[in-house]
């Protein structure tokens, strides 16, 4: 029975990648000085009696580095989309031209850039904590295996494998954070 004990590294790796994917999504929603279609993804619009993501009521484009446009499909929804953007907390003042809503992205000042780098660091720390929690789950599996008769050599092997996976994932988080902070601070 002791030989049958295995730790599911694939599951641990999948969960760590999930934390990384979540971090990338959070980073994408951070407003840098550059326009991005993902900036408006979290914005919900009341459409046809229910809350709907903006990308389901119109086409989101980035025609210029500092401009996001939303081509609303239903003319009657333009006002609601504009209102949702104003109330979203993005700090962007929409301009309407027929069914097209233009979102000019203002230049960020130095103070705001520093605040955003701190927010990015918080997001990265949340991802690190999630990865460490996955590591802890893996180590708990190893402890259960030890209690069920796992040989000490196997235990050391799995502990090393889980730790290497954790180190690699946290390294990826750190790289993503450095890249995002550089992007935010870029004038």
From Swiss-Prot:
It is found in: Cytoplasm. SUPFAM superfamilies: Ribosome recycling factor, RRF. Keywords: Cytoplasm, Protein biosynthesis. The keyword Iron-sulfur does not apply. One of its GO terms (biological process) is cytoplasmic translational termination. One of its GO terms (cellular component) is cytosol. InterPro entries: Ribosome_recyc_fac (IPR002661), Ribosome_recyc_fac_dom (IPR023584), RRF_sf (IPR036191). Pfam families: RRF. CDD domains: RRF. The keyword Thylakoid does not apply. GO terms for molecular function: ribosomal large subunit binding. Belongs to the RRF family. Responsible for the release of ribosomes from messenger RNA at the termination of protein biosynthesis. May increase the efficiency of translation by recycling ribosomes from one round of translation to another. This is Ribosome-recycling factor. The gene is frr.
């Amino acid at each position: 029975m002791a030989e049958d004990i295995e730790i599911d590294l694939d599951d641990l790796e999948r969960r760590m990648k999930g934390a990384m994917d979540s971090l990338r999504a959070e980073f994408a929603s951070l407003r840098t000085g550059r326009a991005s279609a993902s900036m408006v993804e979290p914005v919900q619009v009341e459409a046809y009696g229910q809350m709907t993501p903006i990308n389901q009521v119109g086409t989101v484009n980035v025609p210029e580095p500092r401009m996001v446009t939303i081509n609303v499909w239903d003319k009657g929804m333009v006002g609601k989309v504009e209102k949702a953007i104003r109330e979203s907390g993005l700090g962007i003042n929409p301009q309407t031209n027929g069914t097209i809503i233009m979102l000019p992205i203002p230049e960020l000042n130095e103070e705001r850039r520093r605040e955003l780098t701190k927010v990015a660091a918080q997001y990265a720390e949340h991802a690190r904590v999630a990865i460490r929690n996955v590591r802890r789950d893996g180590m708990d599996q190893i402890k259960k295996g030890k209690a069920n008769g796992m040989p000490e050599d196997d235990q050391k092997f799995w502990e090393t494998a889980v730790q290497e996976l954790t180190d690699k994932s946290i390294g990826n988080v750190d790289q993503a954070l450095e890249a995002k902070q550089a992007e935010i601070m870029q004038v």
